[in-house]
């Protein structure tokens, strides 16, 4: 079986089919245009540059295009890149299914649905349970397909649901340690906190921001969705406001995207759980591509650090 892109090491030659995840135009110091493309397959993605591109080439190499690439792997300032020597658009008789080139969550959708449903079933507050079930049912198809982000963490098919399942397990463990926490609020907050991303983001493949995503963002979108759900279900209770606050504050600070800091205990804990799971996902994926005794490539969202994989971690 042919190697996947994440399995190649620095210095190795590459001759492989990949999917263009994103393509961004830039202008080089010599004034000539170039493209920065992110290329992917199920193992992950890699950055490459296409230099001195013409308008015709720009139109060819766009997101969701499958290409045949030849080149070599290099380490440029701590980042792994693919230096392109040859590239062309793949023929239809060579590859046809884009889904063969995208990274997916390591857990089946039906298993994630079963687990999340169990957490909702455990809720004892009827207002919180009804609101959570209503909103998840409304957006379930997209929720199970979408990534949790365009980059940095859980940026793969079904990444949003996978992120939520991991966070629910963390929430349960923390609630068992600190029984004063309201499990219903915390579980609902975990399930709903990023659900607005099914409106903020364009879809599971070559994900970009929608108009609503750019102008409103997933936090504002979800606060409005909770309000609409409460009206439809005729729920006029403080739980609605608290759930809206938990969603509104889950980024922690204004400079991180939350209009209000957490002012409810469960909101504070949700912020930490969200942050922990996102960072663990970034570290695990970077370390998964690294040999024992070596450092990862720089992880931009983690202060551009390179993490060491101990030599005894085989």
Curated annotation (Swiss-Prot):
Q: Which biological process terms from the Gene Ontology are attached to this UniProt entry?
A: rRNA 3'-end processing
Q: What Pfam families would the database entry show?
A: HD, tRNA_anti-codon
InterPro entries (alphabetical) = 3'-5'_exoribonuclease_YhaM (IPR020873), HD/PDEase_dom (IPR003607), HD_domain (IPR006674), NA-bd_OB-fold (IPR012340), NA-bd_OB_tRNA (IPR004365), YhaM_exoribonuc/phosphodiest (IPR050798)
Q: Which UniProt keywords apply?
A: Exonuclease, Hydrolase, Nuclease
The Gene Ontology terms for molecular function here are: 3'-5'-RNA exonuclease activity; nucleic acid binding
Domain spans labelled HD = 163-279
Q: Key word Nuclease present in the record?
A: yes
Stated EC number for the protein is 3.1.-.-
Keyword Hydrolase assigned to the entry: answer is: yes
Protein role = Shows a 3'-5' exoribonuclease activity.
Q: State the similarity comment.
A: Belongs to the YhaM family.
What is the protein name for this chain?
3'-5' exoribonuclease YhaM
Q: Which organism is it from?
A: Bacillus cereus (strain AH187)
């Amino acid at each position: 079986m042919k190697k996947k892109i994440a399995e190649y090491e620095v210095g190795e030659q590459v001759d492989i089919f990949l999917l263009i995840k994103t393509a961004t135009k830039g202008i080089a110091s010599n004034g000539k245009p170039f493209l920065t493309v992110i290329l992917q397959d199920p193992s992950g993605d890699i950055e490459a540059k296409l230099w001195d591109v013409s308008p015709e080439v720009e139109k060819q190499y766009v997101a969701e295009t499958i290409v045949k690439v030849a080149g070599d792997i290099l380490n440029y300032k701590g980042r792994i890149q693919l230096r392109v020597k040859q590239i062309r658009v793949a023929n239809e008789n060579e590859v046809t299914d884009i889904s063969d080139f995208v990274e997916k969550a390591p857990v089946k959708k039906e298993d994630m649905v079963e687990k999340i449903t169990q957490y909702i079933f455990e809720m004892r507050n009827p207002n919180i349970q009804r609101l959570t079930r209503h909103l998840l049912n409304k957006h379930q198809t997209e929720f199970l397909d979408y990534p949790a982000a365009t980059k940095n963490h859980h940026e793969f098919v079904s990444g949003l649901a996978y992120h939520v399942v991991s966070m629910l397990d963390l929430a349960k463990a923390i609630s068992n340690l600190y029984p004063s926490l309201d499990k219903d609020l915390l579980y609902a907050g975990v399930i709903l906190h990023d659900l607005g991303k099914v409106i903020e983001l364009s879809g599971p493949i070559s994900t970009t921001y929608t108009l609503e995503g750019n102008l409103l963002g997933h936090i504002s979108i979800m606060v409005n969705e909770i309000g609409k759900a409460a009206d439809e279900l005729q729920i006029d209770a403080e739980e609605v406001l608290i759930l809206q606050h938990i969603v509104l504050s889950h980024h922690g600070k204004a400079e991180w995207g939350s209009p209000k800091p957490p002012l409810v205990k469960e909101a504070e804990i949700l912020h930490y759980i969200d942050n922990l799971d996102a960072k663990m996902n970034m570290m695990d994926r970077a370390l998964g591509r690294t040999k024992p005794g070596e450092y990862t490539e720089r992880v931009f969202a983690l202060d551009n650090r390179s993490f060491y994989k101990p030599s005894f971690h085989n």
